């Protein structure tokens, strides 16, 4: 695979997800925000999208960085983007940026980081054959 194609396949997905998050953040607030299940769904979405974003950044960075640095960079990018996303929402009519959303986003990124570390830190089991 050529280097430009490889870079696009690695960096394209996290950048595309960030663009999607930005687009959703630019939408004005709707009126049913006080319905409990809509509130819950949005918080689960915050957690999930940033968990996915962290995993995608890890995937993009793992060949260039050691495991711990790739995981930390993924979390760092996610938290920084969560902060800027909430700041962006303060500029949109009917939207407010909140620190608790940043914390939910960070929790999603940290959950993904924990799963990634757990997955890549486990020793590979070698199947023993008995002859």
Across the structure, where does each feature detected by a protein language model lie?
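"…centered on the first transmembrane helix and the immediately adjacent amphipathic helix/loop
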Residues: 1-59
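Membrane-interface capping segments at transmembrane-helix boundaries
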Residues: 118-128
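Interfacial helix-loop-helix junctions of multi-pass membrane proteins
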Residues: 31-39, 83-106
């Amino acid at each position: 695979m050529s280097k430009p194609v490889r870079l696009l396949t690695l960096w394209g997905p996290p950048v595309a997800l960030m663009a999607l998050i930005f687009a959703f953040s630019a939408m004005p607030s709707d009126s049913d925000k006080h319905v409990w299940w809509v509130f819950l769904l949005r918080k689960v979405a915050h957690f999930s999208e940033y968990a996915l974003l962290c995993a995608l950044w890890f995937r993009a960075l793992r060949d260039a960085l050691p495991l711990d640095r790739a995981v930390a960079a993924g979390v760092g990018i996610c938290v920084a983007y969560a902060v800027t996303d909430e700041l962006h929402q303060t500029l949109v009519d009917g939207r407010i940026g909140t620190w608790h959303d940043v914390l939910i986003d960070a929790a999603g990124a940290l959950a993904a980081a924990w799963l990634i570390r757990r997955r890549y830190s486990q020793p590979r089991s070698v199947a023993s054959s008995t002859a």
